[in-house]
Amino acid sequence: MTGTPVAEAKALYEAGRYAEAEAEARTVSRSRPRDDVYGAVALNIAALATGAQGRHTEALATYDEALPVFGRIFGADHWLTLKLRSDRAQEMTSMGRHAECEAECAAVARAAVRGTGPEMARLAAAARNGQVFALNAQGRHQEAEALAREALAAHRERDPMSLVLRLGLARSLNGQARHEDALAEARGAEKLHRSLPDHQRLPQTGAVELAFATVLFGLRRVPEARRRAAVAHDACLASFGPDHRRTVEARTLLERIDGTRP
């Protein structure tokens, strides 16, 4: 995307400057003709950046605006359109719409498996990650574990996708009270997270610390859990704001640890 109308918005997003990325992307989108490729991509960046600021309802509305444009430009079965559907679905789970997210991610994963090429393979992993998160959120931890392991077996790269799948696996194990197994997965995720370049780590700010805090609380290692939860909360608050799903989860965990929330 270097040298294109969306290059600045993309660079701002990758630098974690989400408010600036959103503003730039929306400016580009408004300036482009109807059904223009760069206008469509700008809408996608705007949706991602809005969600990263914890404004999940607005982000979903932006995805809803972008989806028909992507369909007209690229076609319903193109990997970019399918990726947009996956991203949109995962925004739903940030709003508590877990069953809808699960169903849509499953549909995208099926479509991706029918496709060919590395983009479709990455998309299948991304959609399965959305399913794993939604299953965990519904308390269906054994199903989430099975799907996370299947996805990790199919996706061998040590990249951000493997990171989020491992975090989902840790969450599923913790949900089954298999805390030592979950701790091992959290340690693996931490090692992988540290190996990634900065721009790939930013979207998962606080996620590894939150995973550790949740597991340690399950193991009744309360002082360690509280320290990790506080680090996660402060990092998420600084990066994403108070209303982001991960910030809220970290804050809720801190309240549970402190006994102010059941």
Description of each model-found segment:
Residues 1-262:
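Intrinsic-disorder-linked linear interaction elements in eukaryotic regulatory proteins
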